[in-house]
């Protein structure tokens, strides 16, 4: 079976790469988060399952008697993605796969701001605690990937409490 892990960028068909779209159209089974499955192009197979845990996905793929399957992820498969855990699980299970990366949120934000991002420091505050003041004190632009309890508002509040309230913050949301 051909297994393809696909980054869906902002989660809409418009942010799929051509290779990602081709892999989706050729898949007989598509797995991923429910919100992503709901956004798939209409031409994709209706055989879909809302799974996002690596072990559950591996178990479903092992018992699938099909030629091609796809697993979708929001953002880019290489930027703080659940794809990394799935890659480890697929490797351990001996299941071969390919990866089609998507457009990351940092790329989408940089494009919206008309700014290059090669000098930005990239920090994940998604589902984990972080000290934004310590990160921002080096003077470089910082991109925080947020989620869970670490929202843009909580990061800005922490900056203000750390005497860094003069730091300019830009929030990118629903970029796709």
PLM features: residue spans?
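Short, glycine-/small-residue-rich phosphate/pyrophosphate-handling segment
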Residues: 105-138, 147
